[in-house]
């Protein structure tokens, strides 16, 4: 599956799958990057969901921003990202792996999500 690079709230991001009215924000774990979402995105696309993955600070295209990998930096970025995605999709879900799951839980404690999948939070 091919991914389309773009910027989501100033974060480097990849858009996976066909346009859809429902989508999942994919948050990688420690040492990961937005590119690791390929396998998940393929399965989500088969179920009719588009996936967007982002690089957290200190990872992928943001390696030089390691000092910004703190909740008071990441949580506002993720909240902006979700707000932008809500403008594109009717239904929004979240997948978080490890560090991404932790940041997802911090950023969206009360967000009305259509689905939430956490791997090793």
Q: Which residues does each predicted region cover?
A:
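Conserved alpha/beta-hydrolase
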Residues: 44-63
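The serine-hydrolase catalytic nucleophile loop
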Residues: 30-42
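Gly/Ala-rich beta-loop-alpha elbow adjacent to hydrolase catalytic centers
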Residues: 96-104
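The conserved beta1-alpha1 loop
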Residues: 25-29
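Catalytic nucleophile-loop/oxyanion-hole region of alpha/beta-hydrolase
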Residues: 60-88
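N-terminal cap/lid segment of alpha/beta-hydrolase-fold proteins
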Residues: 1-19
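Proline/glycine-enriched tight loop/beta-turn segments at coil->beta junctions
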Residues: 17-23, 49
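Active-site nucleophile loop of the alpha/beta-hydrolase fold
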Residues: 117-121
């Amino acid at each position: 599956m091919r991914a389309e690079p773009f910027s989501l709230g100033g974060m480097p991001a990849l858009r996976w799958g066909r346009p859809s009215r429902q989508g999942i924000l994919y948050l990688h774990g420690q040492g990961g990057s937005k590119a690791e979402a390929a396998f998940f995105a393929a399965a989500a696309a088969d179920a009719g969901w588009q996936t967007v993955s982002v690089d957290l600070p200190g990872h992928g295209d943001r390696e030089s921003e390691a000092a910004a990998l703190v909740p008071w930096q990441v949580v506002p970025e993720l909240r902006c990202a979700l707000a932008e995605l809500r403008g594109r999709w009717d239904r929004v879900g979240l997948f978080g792996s490890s560090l991404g799951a932790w940041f997802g839980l911090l950023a969206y404690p009360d967000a009305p999500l259509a689905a939430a999948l956490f791997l090793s939070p």
